[in-house]
Amino acid sequence: MSQVNMRDMLKAGVHFGHQTRYWNPKMGKYIFGARNKIHIVNLEKTLPMFNDALSFVERLAQGKNKILFVGTKRSAGKIVAEQAARCGSPYVDHRWLGGMLTNYKTIRASIKRLRDLETQAEDGTFAKLTKKEALMRSRDLEKLDRSLGGIKDMGGLPDALFVIDVDHERIAITEANKLGIPVIGVVDTNSSPEGVDYIIPGNDDAIRAIELYMTSMADAVIRGRNNVAGGTEVYAEEAAAPAAE
């Protein structure tokens, strides 16, 4: 079973919250105190909650369920994309498009357009077009890939969301709540834990903290998949295969 320890969290700075004047009273029970006007998260509370979330993700992965990783702010995007790709999971790292879950039918049509453009780019169709038309399609492809590239192989709605910074990704959480999709979220001292089923109280800004959350979650997915698929490679191949639209 995937586990993190106190040392890992201290090293990553998970305990450093936001300035005390920005605190959200709903996070009060997870705050240990303050130092230099910065709230300190009580890691003795975070530890079991983090590990509960990891166990939940591992169980989901064992049942071949899909976990969608969401982190669109600058400090999170690259790490989210790298770790999601490592464990063969869908992700959103650039911008959450309204309706990504609640209007999935429209999103599915955009994914089909993305796939069509990818095919055209590979089979030489672009080369046969006028320079202007080829440039327009290339830009369209780039834009769609940036927004939807991480979910193009998802093949349907996810079974859970893992979110870095619940305030920044509030639209995603609201959509998941409407559809009854469980939400796992990193919740800092200035944020509201509302709508989050598995709360991980902690720093949602520091790169090292984000790396710890994402690496641990990706490891949990891989561990769960290995229990049924016999290896990460098997799952990575499954995830890379184009989903039926």
UniProtKB/Swiss-Prot annotation:
Record's keyword terms, sorted: Ribonucleoprotein, Ribosomal protein
BP GO terms, sorted: translation
Gene Ontology CC terms: cytosolic small ribosomal subunit
InterPro entries: Ribosomal_uS2, Ribosomal_uS2_bac/mit/plastid, Ribosomal_uS2_CS, Ribosomal_uS2_flav_dom_sf
Family the UniProt entry places it in: Belongs to the universal ribosomal protein uS2 family.
PANTHER family hit by this protein: 30S RIBOSOMAL PROTEIN S2 PROKARYOTIC AND ORGANELLAR, SMALL RIBOSOMAL SUBUNIT PROTEIN US2M
Protein known as: Small ribosomal subunit protein uS2
Organism: Pseudomonas putida (strain ATCC 47054 / DSM 6125 / CFBP 8728 / NCIMB 11950 / KT2440)
Gene this chain is encoded by: rpsB
